[in-house]
Amino acid sequence: MEFLAGDALNGRGSGTRDEWIAASYVAAQMRRLGLEPLGDDGGYVQKVTTERAELTSAPVLTIGGRRFTHGKEIYANPGAARVVGRLETWAPGAVIQPGAAVLLPDPAPEDFTPPQGALVLSPRPSIIKERWSTFLARPARVAPRLLKTQHSPPSVVFLDPDAYAVAASAARGDTITLQAEAKPAVPSYTWNAVGRLRGEPGKGVILLSAHIDHLGNRTDPPGGSGDQIFNGADDDASGAVAVLELMEALTHGSRPKHTIVFALFGSEETGGTGSRFFAEKPVVPLTDILANLQFEMLGRPDGKLPPQTLWLTGYERSTLGPELARRGARLVQDPHPEQKFFERSDNFEFARRGVVAHTVSSYGLHADYHTPADEIGGIDFAHMTTAIRSMLEPVRSLANSEFVPQWLPGKKP
């Protein structure tokens, strides 16, 4: 934790040299423990080539001649410098095509999966509503795009009440545009670290993962803070440490029946690029992966839960969470379903491809999220240690059992 979340790594910005250093550090731990390398050229690190266009102006959303600007009325996560779609209103069971502009109801549905290339117009969820001015202060960035992919990532735009009212009054089929000035796209890179603890031949795979990147540093941190480094101790050095600690424990003792793959992904903060690459070009067949557990923000307790308790996104969607709890994990249902955390971490790249994949967390919506104040001093190590330790034997048991997690009827993304 001291190394990953220390100032020396400058906040482990997505796709930066500091992220590469973090991936190399994880690779060194994998090598020390004797894991089988699954990275490039016989090593543990995967170098993922992407292309990214740097924006030179704030994105502007145009609806029926009305213009709304990032940083004023909207907060945009663009998947490309220019995105155009015809307006559709989401409804249960609706089939949304790539390239559509989708208006979500207020509150936004929990089971909506944005297709690649779509333009999603959303009301503000509570976590953004409560800190709207802080979010508006952030510059917009185009998500990196994997090479040789057909569509860009979805573009998600959060609207203030006035902008949302204009969108809601627009007619179905109206053209909606999100556009910004941008430099020509140039190659960029991100890095994953991947190793395997091989199990018995013919058995399945358990994927344990976290993300190693964070927000880097900025010369204009929110709130006028003099601290320019976004250390990301909770988000997600805590999850990376959880995977490293489980890796340390699971490599000792007898070989598991099922293979365990440990993956630390890059560029989660810019659209899940590292995990998307892994899912599109898996080092093990996705059909062999029985379960994916992503570890995200476990460094502080959630005040809604008993002490030293973790929660699982999408707990009610599959048989995995209840089974882990039955085997001793201090694991309960996500107490923040309105935040749609199931869809907001690397697990979702696997879940939408059919893998039973969830995120383990204890994030209680603390105010230090995505600010320079997310530092090691805020980590509750007693909580983190007990909670992670409670996952060890259930994960070990899962890796040695015949239990196969399943999606519950109608709950698969």
Task: Give residue ranges: language-model regions.
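N-terminal capping segment at the start of a domain
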Residues: 1-17, 33, 37-42, 47, ...
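Second-shell loop/turn segments in exported
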Residues: 7-17, 32, 47-49, 75, ...
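Extracytoplasmic/secreted proteins, especially bacterial periplasmic and envelope-associated proteins
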Residues: 3, 17-32, 43, 162-166, ...
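Noncatalytic luminal/extracellular "stalk/propeptide" segments of secretory-pathway proteins
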Residues: 10-110, 315
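Structural recognition of the beta-strand scaffold that forms the well-ordered cores
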Residues: 2-5, 39, 103, 118-122, ...
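His/Asp/Glu-rich mid-to-C-terminal helical/loop segments that flank catalytic regions of hydrolases
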Residues: 248, 367-413
